[in-house]
Amino acid sequence: MERRRFLELSAGAVALSVINGCTRHKPSTDTTHRTLTASDYHATRRFAETKFGRIAYVERGTADGALFLHGFPLNSFQWRGVLDPLSVHRRCVAPDFLGLGFTEVSENQSVAPNAQVEMIVALLDSLSIKSVDLIANDSGGAVAQLFVARYPQRARTLLLTNCDTERDSPPPAVHPVIELARAGKFADEFLVPSVADKALARSENGALGSLCYSKPGNPNDEAIDYYLGPLVSSPLRKSQANAYAVALAPNPLAGIEAELRRCTIPTRIVWGTADNIFSSASPDYLDRTFPHSRGVRRIVGAKLFFPEEYPELIAEEALTLWRA
């Protein structure tokens, strides 16, 4: 099924307008830290043995922990541009969720958001990390909200980018993906063709590309293979990719608002304005809901997976939040 059809089935793309106070991002000229490559990830990937399975993760730095939660159908490679810069300040840990990336789990293991939260706790325990600064995107943002609601003592700060909210989870644009996954067809009909044809993957009809990225040529071939290759590598991995999508409904954040309103964790929201998957009202909703919100920064023209395209911006926002 095509991305265009997904949007048509979900009432079409939302018309976007310039929002007062939006920030136009200018790329940094700082070249002190480089973006990690797939080879770097393969060479340094570690596995934590937990009751949930072998959790794949990449780690950089020392000191206090910072945890990076990726989107769907991505994995920790999404954060390759921020790990080195922020490793000067934090022990940066970027895991692959259950059912995604290079994490290895059994056929019967749940990959639902609640299971992801408990997996994260087990991972942190295995690494002797008591508390973390959270940075999250997309479905990783839902997991982050569940984490701070359930384990507030284990989070110091929260940086949310375009992601689910209780009022928009799963968003209408994702409903057709979920239905396709329920039929057991998402991986075969959507992911497999995108791995075989990288130009298709980058197009508006592919698994990634112009719907999720604003910069032409993104994601590159290396990223597509790293993201999607593991998900189509076996019948089990295909079924787990389907299961991840299915588990996005019913709303995993139902009833969480009251808990988030009691949250004392400093929170910052950074939102791409060209995202037509999540509601444009969501950043203000999050700002109102978290009592210790540090406000919203809007990135004009940025789409769902913009943290991957603007790592220096994410690093800047993280450092500002951590120092506040």
Feature locations, PLM:
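Flexible "cap/lid" subdomain of the alpha/beta-hydrolase fold that forms the substrate-access gate
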Residues: 26-45, 52-60, 89, 93, ...
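Catalytic histidine-centered segment of alpha/beta-hydrolase-like enzymes
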Residues: 302-310
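Conserved acidic functional residues
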Residues: 71, 138, 308-309
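N-terminal export signals
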Residues: 5-24
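Conserved HGGG/HGGXW glycine-rich cap/lid loop of the alpha/beta-hydrolase fold
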Residues: 59-102
